[in-house]
């Protein structure tokens, strides 16, 4: 779920 973490940064 690395993508989910990236979305949080945006």
From Swiss-Prot:
UniProt keyword list: Antimicrobial, Fungicide, Plant defense
Domain of life of the organism encoding this protein: Eukaryota
Swiss-Prot/TrEMBL GO biological process terms: defense response to fungus; killing of cells of another organism; negative regulation of cell population proliferation
Function of the protein: Has strong antifungal activity against F.oxysporum, M.arachidicola and P.piricola, and weaker antifungal activity against B.cinerea, C.comatus and R.solani. Exerts antifungal activity against M.arachidicola with an IC(50) of 75 uM. Inhibits the proliferation of leukemia cells in vitro. Inhibits human immunodeficiency virus-1 (HIV-1) reverse transcriptase. Lacks mitogenic activity towards murine splenocytes.
Family from the record: Belongs to the DEFL family.
Name of the protein in its database record: Defensin-like protein
Species of origin: Phaseolus coccineus
Organism ancestry: Eukaryota, Viridiplantae, Streptophyta, Embryophyta, Tracheophyta
């Amino acid at each position: 779920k690395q993508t989910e973490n990236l979305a949080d940064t945006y």
